Amino acid sequence: MTTKIFVDTNIFIDVFTANPDFVSESKAVLELCEQNIIEGYTTASAITDIFYLIRKLLHDKEKAYQVLGHILNIIKVLPVTNEDVLNACAEHAYDFEDCLQATCAKANHCSAIVTRDEKGFKDFDITLLSPSALVDQYKPK
């Protein structure tokens, strides 16, 4: 059975902005998803954020849709239910978006969240992995 991992938005941003400090590890996370070694998940709100950023970077709506199509071939979008939103609201978290993502990840049985922003998720009782920690788990030994 393939491991279900929630992929935080910053992983995508690293790849599409070619962030020199993080691009290789973040790209490796998405490659694990593309190779079906892990199942990668995100939320619809993250997808809208990603599309906006890609379109802004590329200055080309059609190219942004092509990139988004590729993402959607390797990442699945989790449902966000009314119950998820209510549960996240009840937390009164400092970062509501991270709280809602963690709530969705847990509700959909993701085993971990891969993120560079571990402090944003530390209070939500779900395993957190840096991109390098996740990639290291799947390196041939």
Residue positions per predicted region:
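PIN-domain endoribonuclease scaffold, especially VapC-family toxins
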Residues: 4, 27-41, 45-92, 99, ...
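Acidic, PIN/NYN-like endoribonuclease modules and their adjacent C-terminal/linker elements
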Residues: 1-4, 28, 74, 103, ...
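Acidic active-site catalytic centers that drive phospho-/nucleotidyl reactions
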Residues: 8, 98, 117
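Short, well-structured N-terminal submotif of metal-dependent ribonuclease cores
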Residues: 1-42, 56-62, 123, 135-141
